Amino acid sequence: YTTILGEVYLNHELSNTENVGGYFSHHSSAGGIEGLRLDDDFTKTNLNIHYSQKLRDFSWKVDGGFDLQTYNWYGLPDGFYTDAQISEIDSGHAFHSFYAGGKLKFDDAIIKEGSVRFRRFGDDQDSGENRFVAKVSFDVPVQDEIISTEFYIDYISGSFDRSFNTTDELKYGNVIFGLAPSYQIKQDDLTVNLGVNLVYLNDNEFDESKFFIYPNIEASYRLVDEILIAYGGV
């Protein structure tokens, strides 16, 4: 069988502060495994393009791309289907997705960085999913100390043409709001990050909401300088 595999990376410096680049990959096979009763070819294609710029006080980057994939589910149990039934089976399945996002990073400000990303996923069986994620990291001064904090929103919604047991359309969706403050303590070779993750979850389809509190604690100790570090977290 014939297989094609290729990748291309491109990067170009437009100026001292601007950069543009891209990535393309393709992997496919014409199939031809002996003894199969169904098609077994597949393709995977990916494309990404990005642009970035670094200014005096901040830098930013935007990117976007898409993924295309086709597969064949060619496994069959012996003696379960007749030749007529096998000839009617459509074993192909195609997936596609596209995404776009951006990131902004400040060099010396209370707000350290922020990012957004949207992705749309679907297939040829009328399934689809949308996801949007936004994050912002900032420092909160408390007297002479700094509390590093991250706030994020994670939204997802999707649907299937039908559920497994019925022909009714199956939908799902929820949105998460999270706040994660953290305080760092350093003493000699010991570093401790004390934090907590506050999460609010709202289920859009079932009209339910929940609130969670998770510990976010990490500690590291340098046993041998630049060679061995002990680490633990919860």
What residue spans do the PLM features occupy?
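Transmembrane beta-strands of outer-membrane beta-barrel pores
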Residues: Y1, H26-A30, F66-N72, F106-D108, ...
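Outer-membrane beta-barrel translocator/receptor signature
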Residues: Y1-E34, D39-T45, F58
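Surface-exposed extracellular loop regions of Gram-negative outer-membrane beta-barrel proteins
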Residues: H12-I33, E150, Y172-D203
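Outer-membrane beta-barrel strand-turn architecture
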Residues: E13-N16, Q53-D57, F106-I110, V140-D144, ...
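Transmembrane beta-strands of outer-membrane beta-barrel proteins
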Residues: V20-G22, W60-G64, K112-V116, F132, ...
